[in-house]
């Protein structure tokens, strides 16, 4: 470029000015890609057996990685005993949208579950779709860890948008997808119901393995029902008829 260098200094050399890329403009830049680009430039000025050996090593490693392998195929599935096995099911004539977490696997389990959202965006895609489809209501899956992290904002957005949606909060007290760590922060089922009620959720139902373990003074928000897990299908059919945002804590 004129004026870019001091008088008497070597002229600058532009690489890629005519569409010949030194490095790929898109995708991943691996150490091997960068090493080959540097070696190609150096080879114009200096020939080295060491450089040739290192390039041959990189070629051999990548060829080994690219070699086809025969392996048994196993589709991922929920762990035995995980509540997601049941909680991600919806009535046959209903639909659900997926989110971040192990429950994402319900997308390929024939459970009328589609789409993927980022963490904290569960159900938000429905806010844009709802006004352009004949479908009145959907379910949205959300884990308890996601809820505490950022999922509550998605529910708040749904309340503000006045759409018909039922969030299924899949409470398993663990971040199972990354090793079973406990969920950060204090987050009990009664606390969740009080927070949701304060956000303007129309109706909240808790499905518990043993509803009797929750006494009357457990601290649930007013009007919250606690029912057995066996009522899942019936409760979902009730909630989908309720206008506005509803929540099922499973």
Protein language model annotation of sequence segments:
Residues 1, 174-250:
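Glycine-rich ThDP/TPP pyrophosphate-binding loop and its adjacent helix/strand module
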Residues 1, 16-32, 72, 77-84, ...:
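Hydrophobic alpha-helical scaffolding
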Residues 1-53:
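Terminal amphipathic helices with adjacent charged low-complexity linkers/tails
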Residues 14-17, 66-75, 103-112, 135, ...:
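Gly-rich Lys/Arg/Thr-decorated short loops/hinges at beta-loop-alpha junctions or inter-strand turns
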Residues 14-17, 53, 96-99, 140-141, ...:
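General beta-strand structural signal in soluble alpha/beta enzymes
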Residues 25-37, 74-77, 82-89, 120-124, ...:
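Conserved active-site and cofactor/substrate-binding residues in soluble primary-metabolism enzymes
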Residues 42, 46-109, 149:
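Cofactor-pocket helix-loop regions in the catalytic cores of large enzyme subunits
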Residues 85-89, 95-177, 184-190:
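Thiamine diphosphate
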């Amino acid at each position: 470029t004129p004026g870019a260098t001091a008088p008497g200094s070597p002229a600058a050399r532009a690489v890629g000015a005519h569409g010949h890329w030194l490095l790929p403009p898109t995708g991943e830049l691996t150490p091997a890609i960068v090493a080959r680009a540097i070696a190609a430039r150096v080879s114009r000025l200096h020939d080295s057996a060491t450089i040739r050996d290192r390039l041959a090593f990189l070629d051999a490693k990548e060829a080994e990685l690219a070699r086809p392998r025969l392996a048994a195929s196993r589709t991922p599935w929920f762990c035995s005993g995980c509540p997601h096995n049941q909680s991600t099911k919806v009535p046959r004539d209903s639909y659900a949208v997926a989110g971040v977490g192990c429950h994402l696997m319900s997308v390929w389990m024939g459970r009328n579950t589609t789409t993927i959202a980022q963490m904290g965006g569960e159900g938000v895609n429905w806010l844009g779709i709802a006004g352009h489809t004949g479908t009145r209501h959907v379910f949205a899956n959300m884990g308890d860890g996601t809820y505490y992290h950022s999922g509550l904002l998605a529910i708040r957005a749904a309340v503000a948008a006045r759409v018909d949606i039922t969030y299924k909060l899949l409470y398993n007290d663990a971040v199972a997808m990354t090793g079973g760590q406990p969920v950060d922060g204090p987050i009990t089922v009664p606390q969740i119901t009080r927070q949701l009620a304060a956000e303007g959720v129309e109706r909240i139902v808790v499905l518990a393995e043993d509803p009797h373990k929750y006494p009357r003074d457990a601290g649930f928000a007013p009007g919250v029902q606690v029912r057995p897990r066996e009522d899942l299908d019936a409760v979902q059919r009730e909630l989908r008829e309720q206008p506005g945002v509803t929540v099922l804590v499973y």
